[in-house]
Amino acid sequence: MSETQVNALPQWKDLQEHAAEMNQSQRHLKHLLQDRERLAACSLRGGGLFYDHSRQRVVSETMALLYDLAEARQVKARFAQMVSGGIVNPSEGRAALHTACRRFDGQPVWVGQQDVMPAIRSIRDAVKRFSGQVHDGTLRGSTGKRFAHVVVVGIGGSYLGPEFVARALQSSADKGLRLHFLSNVDIDNFGAVIEAVDPETTLWVVVSKSYTTVETLANANLAAQFMRDRGLDPLKQLVTVTAKGSPGDDPNNPALASFNMFDFIGGRYSVSSAVGAVPLSLSLIHISEPTRPRRQ
């Protein structure tokens, strides 16, 4: 039997009726904000974050109705299924375990018969070692200069999450290692990046699960040619974040470093995987810190 569509549930119809009421002029946000207790009633704190929805056109009844709908759709049970490794992407037969990248409790997370945590910890530790070697100068550019710039090359979820986090935490960034993002195939984006960097001190981080994404490879090829034109070996200043066995994870054409992505982590949720951990650990130094608050 197929599952009832959400818009056929009585809880949905209750919300529709409530929405009509909330669209009345007396429920305008400017009137709702006159309530001095509104901020306390419409906010949450946790994990070092403050969530404020007091500026949304909702009241306590709205939230109660939304919670009723969530209960009818078994949101908590489905979330528990997701974080425990259940198949929640039936079209591809995959788990969705971005949450596992935020775990530091040592507990296993099973996908079928496999505990995925050892592989996640292995990548996490490898990224930590790599970023440490960049920061202490053990790893340098092909001419022996310390890295001063990191350019993330990607598109969609392969760059957007890391860029958001980098901007939000830029006051804590390492001022000696500037982070740049190259996502647009418009030549102006590439031109702006190369104007801001020194090729001898630039580390290129190319992020693509398949390593066949047309836009990402177009920019990666531009970057490689930019380096070659200046007498530099692009592979010695290249890091790839990609699926194991992809063209970007080729032992016959090795980059300075390569970190694997997992098929159970989708692009838009990948910031706490190597996708975000590599650039953010280089810019923000402490690899575990960006992921720890998100556990809650």
Name the predicted role of every residue range.
Residues S2-T4:
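Expand to "…catalyze enediolate/carbanion chemistry for C-C bond making/breaking, isomerization
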Residues V6-D14, H18-T143:
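Extended, charge-enriched "interface" segments that sit outside catalytic cores
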Residues L32-Q34, V153, T291:
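Single, functionally critical "micro-switch" positions that shape active/binding sites
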Residues R129-G137, G144-S288:
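Glycine-rich phosphate-binding loops that contact phosphosugars or nucleotide phosphates
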Residues H286-Q296:
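Single conserved hydrophobic/aromatic residue that forms the stacking wall/gate
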